[in-house]
Curated annotation (Swiss-Prot):
It comes from Vicia faba. Glycans are attached at residue 259. It holds the Pfam family BURP. Seed. Residues 1-22 form the signal peptide. Sequence repeats lie at residues 50-55, 83-88, 101-106, 166-183, 202-222. Residues 166-222 are annotated as: 2 X approximate repeats. Keywords: Glycoprotein, Repeat, Signal. This is Embryonic abundant protein USP87.
Length: 268
């Protein structure tokens, strides 16, 4: 199955906050990409910042991170119900089995149960390169260093709140081997930026059961040998390394890819 690459007109880029730079992170963003406002998704990913008993990924958002499916399911009129694995947290970190006391649910774990050090300094999975960063500036620097250019763009999901039934309207390919940056579910602002080889990112246009139109950033893994075998079998009844497996990316994350267009709004 072939998917059209995103065109300038159809490209789904992050929503922007149309405000003048008034904070250090906004000033830094403007220094890299002048006249391009800080995207709203990044503002949302930075909230809350150190607030007591306040985590960035709310309970109603968990199903955004707990849906596995096959690549051939990405076609118009396909129905999806979010959440097809009992291990809700595992889909956030689906690449490795539990080891050395570090569980797959680390991204959704309470900080008293797991520490950031457990996650950030744990061994990488097969074909994975990862870095933990503690600010938007560090994320930008890391991604620019990775691609060797500021001509890049970021793409995110905008799942509708309290909706878990969707129908696919359209599928657009974003690119291969994107760098994903996820907000970890701790009060302290920390992002996990990682790239897994042999992956393809898509933007999937969805219509919720109440008629709301949304976009879902989606990643398909063509090499699943580094994924959690129990998770794969639980959700899809397949074994490692047999077929491509995909999952949605929730609202508190972004994919960075090279920008080959001339559309300034997407040069971020």
């Amino acid at each position: 199955m072939e998917f059209a690459h995103l065109t300038v007109l159809s490209l789904f880029c992050l929503a922007f906050v149309g405000i003048t730079a008034t904070s250090p992170r906004e000033d830094y963003w403007q220094s890299i990409w002048p006249n391009t406002p800080l995207p709203k998704t990044f503002s949302d990913m930075l909230i809350p910042s150190g607030k007591t008993n306040s985590l960035p990924i709310k309970s109603e958002e968990l199903k955004q991170y707990s849906t596995l499916f096959f690549e051939h399911d990405l076609h118009p009129r396909k129905n999806f119900i979010l959440g097809n694995t009992n291990s809700v947290g595992s889909i956030i970190r689906p690449f490795t089995k539990s080891r050395q006391g570090v569980t797959d649910s680390i991204w959704l774990a309470n900080k008293e149960k797991q520490s950031l050090e457990d996650f950030c300094y744990s061994p990488t999975a097969i074909a994975e390169h990862k870095h933990c960063v503690s600010s938007l500036k560090s994320m930008i620097d890391q991604v620019i260093s990775h691609f060797g250019s500021t001509k890049i763009k970021a793409i995110s999901s905008n799942f509708a709140p309290y909706q878990d039934q969707y129908v696919v309207e359209d599928v657009k390919k974003v690119g291969d081997n994107a760098v994903m940056c996820h907000r970890l579910n701790f009060e302290k602002v920390v992002f996990n930026c990682h790239q897994v080889r042999d992956t393809t990112a898509y933007v999937v246009s969805l219509v919720a059961s109440d008629g709301t139109k949304t976009k879902a950033l989606t990643v398909c893994h063509h090499d699943t040998r580094g994924m959690n075998p129990e998770l794969l079998y639980e959700a899809l009844e397949v074994t490692l390394g047999t077929v491509p497996v995909c999952h949605f990316i929730g609202n508190k994350a972004a994919a960075w890819v090279p920008n080959h267009t001339a559309d300034n709004l997407c040069v971020m």
